[in-house]
């Protein structure tokens, strides 16, 4: 009798252990730890922070000032250590010199090879109506405006100011210039996938990025190439769009 009791006792114990193990396997997995990711972005003119009061010099020494310098960055993608991609969906940055801190989203803790993004907007976003976005959204109606109502699209880069147009290039910055660069064909991929960083548990991560206006204006002659609405001077708009990826670096 005792042997039978022992046998049934052991059998019940084994069944209980199997059931417990099954419950453990069915338990919800522990979610991966995440931390907040943000970008600290400087818009510089060479080694000087861009602003709307300073007189700057371009690569040839020609003087210019800025009264507007805003641009869109979007479609951010993190490159994981194994080469796979982590898109940061629904994030659009409207960058201007006065605002340097841009909060992105929570991302998994781990090692990353770098980041990719677009200068400008993808075609779907580019052709949405800014009136549908709430005030404060980067895609909402802005003042001054950064959307072409007549062209149904956003201005990816809006740079305006005054420049010296003397032949010798030794005068004062008093002639208006404007570069309004947009249209689907002029979005450009920015590849910073060779800039590794790590997101550590318990510490929010901030990426330090710099855009150099002098690189955006590389090989642009302010005296003779001082205006484009894109459609009316596509070669100049294309030159500026082509320059943009090389203007942005991670510090």
Segments from the language model and where they lie:
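C-terminal motif of bacterial Sec signal peptides marking the signal peptidase cleavage site
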Residues: 18-22
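A short, solvent-exposed, low-complexity linear motif enriched for acidic/polar residues
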Residues: 24-251
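Bacterial N-terminal signal peptides that target proteins for export
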Residues: 2-10
């Amino acid at each position: 009798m005792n042997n039978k009791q022992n046998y049934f006792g052991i059998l019940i114990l084994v069944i209980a252990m199997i059931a417990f193990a099954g419950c453990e396997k069915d338990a919800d997995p522990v979610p991966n730890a995440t931390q907040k990711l943000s970008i600290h972005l400087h818009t510089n003119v060479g080694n000087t922070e861009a602003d709307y009061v300073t007189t700057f010099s371009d690569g040839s020494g020609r003087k210019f000032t800025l009264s507007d310098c805003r641009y869109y960055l979007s479609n951010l993608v993190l490159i994981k250590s194994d080469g796979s991609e982590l898109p940061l969906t629904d994030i659009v940055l409207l960058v201007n010199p006065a605002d340097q801190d841009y909060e992105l989203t929570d991302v998994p803790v781990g090692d990353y090879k770098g980041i990719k993004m677009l200068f400008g907007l993808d075609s779907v976003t580019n052709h949405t109506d800014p009136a549908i976005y709430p005030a404060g959204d980067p895609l909402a109606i802005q003042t001054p405006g950064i959307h072409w109502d007549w062209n149904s699209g956003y201005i990816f880069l809006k740079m305006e100011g005054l420049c010296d147009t003397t032949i010798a290039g030794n005068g004062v910055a008093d002639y208006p210039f404007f570069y309004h660069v947009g249209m689907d064909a002029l979005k450009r991929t920015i590849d910073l996938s060779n800039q590794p960083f790590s997101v550590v548990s318990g510490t929010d991560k901030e990426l330090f990025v710099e855009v150099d206006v002098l690189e955006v204006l590389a090989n642009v002659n302010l005296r003779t190439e001082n205006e484009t609405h894109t459609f009316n001077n596509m070669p100049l708009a294309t030159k500026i769009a082509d320059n943009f990826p090389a203007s942005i670096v991670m510090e």
